[in-house]
């Protein structure tokens, strides 16, 4: 189920232009990552997909249908949404949180609860946590519940707004790997927002680097962007999030490519194990999108 932005702009009442003439195709069953600094319009773009924000001009199409003609509430209920800090209802159990949207769409309680328990398995949580409340969970567990809730109605589209930004680095790495596993198994159309270029390169099949006003500085596969930054802005953006190093790619044998920093030292290797791009730095390998 592809998503298409056609010349979309968003101007707020105070005159702020959050999005200026933005066009993009989000391919079906792939992960597209919108990455940029604060004020780049990435979250506004995400929120326009499920009509939490309305474009000032332009069109957004889902499966070739203009969502401006869709009723907002039913639209939102068929699109998964995962946010930072999980957004769980504190007075409801884990089971009830995950089962909320299915129940709202008319699924009987027993079936909704069974689906919720299955999703706890899917996101790697013990079913014994089902009767706990969010405050009784760790930050990583809360985020996993948030992902389970986003998947509860088996949506074709999953929107993720900096979902791992509030957890510690170790938990974040675990959650990123879990998302890669889930996407490999489920094949959703994922739109993921982050300010972290490393996270974008790790998770994205398509990475879209944004400047102010959601102007596209560069879009493409992580390997393409690393090999050929489109501008000084892109090169700088990549360098800042890598300890102010500018990375370039030297091609090696086969599908491997050597990452070289600005001083000429090797920073890692891009490999393609099993057809998926990965970063290999020292002895650690992390998946990074379809090659």
Predicted regions and their residues:
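A short, proline-enriched helix->beta-strand linker immediately N-terminal to the Walker B motif
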Residues: 152-156
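Catalytic Walker B motif of ABC-type/P-loop ATPase nucleotide-binding domains
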Residues: 158-162
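Helix-to-loop junction immediately C-terminal to a conserved catalytic motif
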Residues: 50
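ABC ATPase NBD coupling module
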Residues: 66-80, 104, 109-110
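Short helical segment in ABC ATPase nucleotide-binding domains corresponding to the A-loop/adjacent helical element
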Residues: 95-103, 113, 117
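Conserved ABC ATPase "signature" region
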Residues: 110-128
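Conserved ABC ATPase signature
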Residues: 133-137, 141-143
